[in-house]
Amino acid sequence: MNNFSNLVDALIKDEMEGTPRHELVLFLGKTPELLQAVAGFPDYDLVITGKVIGKVCFDHGIGPSLLKRLPDIINSPKSIFRSANQHQTDSVIVLTYELKGLAPIIMPIRHSQSIGRNGVFNIITSVYGKEGPDPEVKWQKQGLQLWTNPI
């Protein structure tokens, strides 16, 4: 088991015991080259906070087994879209191949975010199943698509 996986387990356990560790920052590694090339993300470390891990697991119902695979999942996206929120020019939405029920799992990611005194990072701000009409079709029609896997 790798360090990221162990930390996810520890964070979920702590949250279940009533002692959440929201302040922790978990490193997934360097920002994938694809995000740098397609979305203009800087070459910073890609991170997720303990608070987001807790929210994703307990509020969005994404299981620990998927959370532990985030470093691999982020390196093999289905598509990448600009945020539909015009005020979030520092954000992209990564559409994964993973599903929660019938809903595709997406990951909003922001670049160049300061986290306390830890430095500047690219940060996964959430992970959840996008319910409703197919978001891929909707976002393509809105002209938000930056990249899609040609396979």
Residue ranges of each PLM-predicted region?
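Ribonuclease/tRNase effector modules and their secretory precursors
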Residues: 1-151
